[in-house]
Amino acid sequence: MKFKRVFGLVMDSVGAGAAPDANKFGDEGADTLGHVGHHFAGKLALPNLAKIGLSNLRETPIEGVPVADDPHAYYGKMREISAGKDSMDGHWEMMGLPVRKALSTFPNGFPADIITKLETFSGRKVIGNRPESGTKIIAELGEQQMKTGDLIVYTSGDSVLQIAAHEDVIPLAELYKICEYARSLVNGPEYLVGRIIARPYVGPDADHFTRTANRRDFTLEPTGETDLDRLQAAGVRVVAVGKTNDIFSGHGIDEAYHNESNMDGMDHVDHVMTEDFTGFCFINLVDFDAMYGHRRNPDGFGQALMDFDQRLGTVLANMHDDDLLMITADHGNDPTYTGTDHTREQVPLLVYSPSFKQGGSLGVRSPFADFGATVLDNFGVAGNHEGHSFLAELK
């Protein structure tokens, strides 16, 4: 079965239970979906995700999300092989480029040579410089930053360098320029950092600071060809929605839409679905992760899932017989877990087309590259053998 349009949708950080190697990351027992369901005590209403097998893919159903008796969809899990548990690792691996060598992390903050260069280039002092939750460090240092014009620099358990500044104090163009310079400092060989993230915020004081949608990711350039490049080279249209474009530094992408929020992202999806094209639309919805996972907010996480599920109903209704929808995640971020970092989890895999005559289990797929291999197979494009297509299993 071949499809004219393939929609790959990443529910950022919506993990499906601890991966077998979770202990190496200190993430034993993490289960984003399971724990959010438990937190909602049976009131997590996800009828559309349930219909296409969200609880079917689990050993234990999500509380409030019934197992579908006869899902005309395929379901399973994917297991990562990349060395990290960041968005970059997950998305690159999906597109045939697993990150086998661990990137640089900074549990004690960034070394003096990086900080000095940032200060010299920007003419501004760096404050913070430690692993911290973004909301917490902005609440703590944001008022000082407004008075002094300093740069709030921080990291996490992932390979990221984040720079926060108030939009009224440091204009976005200047913040982005500083982040571009920071990107140039950590492209190897000594330091190899996955993402530089501009984290602008607004608000009058610590009680009212909010990070804005003007966040930008300056990602390490892909270290090799990805499935997006292969599709583009073969003349297959590639559309990116959300931070997907940033994650691949624009490589292999023909058209990109920036998201203000999950709902804005779904507006873009609705729009793209009205277009007549042959190709792949790769979507990332980041609010689950950025707004609720890192902030350890299970209430917000569950509500975001329910809001997404409602919008998914429209997508399912608008699909053509020759459309394929594949829903997954890039890692976990259990909002009930300790700390504020991503969690090493398996991720859901839900595959649907109105043309399916049946449904069933796709099992546990590893690596994530099976996802991209299936897209390539659909369009008759050769891959690099990192993943194995499951297209032939879809009937």
Curated annotation (Swiss-Prot):
Q: Which reaction does it catalyse?
A: 2-deoxy-alpha-D-ribose 1-phosphate = 2-deoxy-D-ribose 5-phosphate; alpha-D-ribose 1-phosphate = D-ribose 5-phosphate
Look up the record and report any one GO term of the cellular component aspect. Answer: cytosol
Which GO biological process entries does UniProt record here? 2-deoxyribose 1-phosphate catabolic process; 5-phosphoribose 1-diphosphate biosynthetic process; metabolic compound salvage; nucleotide metabolic process
Cofactors, names only: Mn(2+)
Q: How is the cofactor bound?
A: Binds 2 manganese ions.
Q: Which GO terms describe its molecular function?
A: magnesium ion binding; manganese ion binding; phosphopentomutase activity
What is this protein's record name? Phosphopentomutase
The EC category is: isomerase
Source organism per UniProt:
Levilactobacillus brevis (strain ATCC 367 / BCRC 12310 / CIP 105137 / JCM 1170 / LMG 11437 / NCIMB 947 / NCTC 947)
Give the EC number. Answer: 5.4.2.7
Q: Which residues bind Mn(2+) 1?
A: D12, D330, H331
Return the Pfam families for the record: Metalloenzyme (PF01676)
**Task of the protein:** Isomerase that catalyzes the conversion of deoxy-ribose 1-phosphate (dRib-1-P) and ribose 1-phosphate (Rib-1-P) to deoxy-ribose 5-phosphate (dRib-5-P) and ribose 5-phosphate (Rib-5-P), respectively.
**Domain of life from the UniProt record:** Bacteria
What the entry lists under Gene3D superfamilies is as follows: Alkaline Phosphatase, subunit A, Phosphopentomutase
Cell compartment(s), UniProt: Cytoplasm
Binding-site positions, Mn(2+) 2: D289, H294, H342
UniProt cross-references to NCBIfam families, sorted A to Z: deoB, PRK05362.1
Sorted UniProt keywords: Cytoplasm, Isomerase, Manganese, Metal-binding
Give the similarity note. Answer: Belongs to the phosphopentomutase family.
* Pathway named in the protein's UniProt entry: Carbohydrate degradation; 2-deoxy-D-ribose 1-phosphate degradation; D-glyceraldehyde 3-phosphate and acetaldehyde from 2-deoxy-alpha-D-ribose 1-phosphate: step 1/2
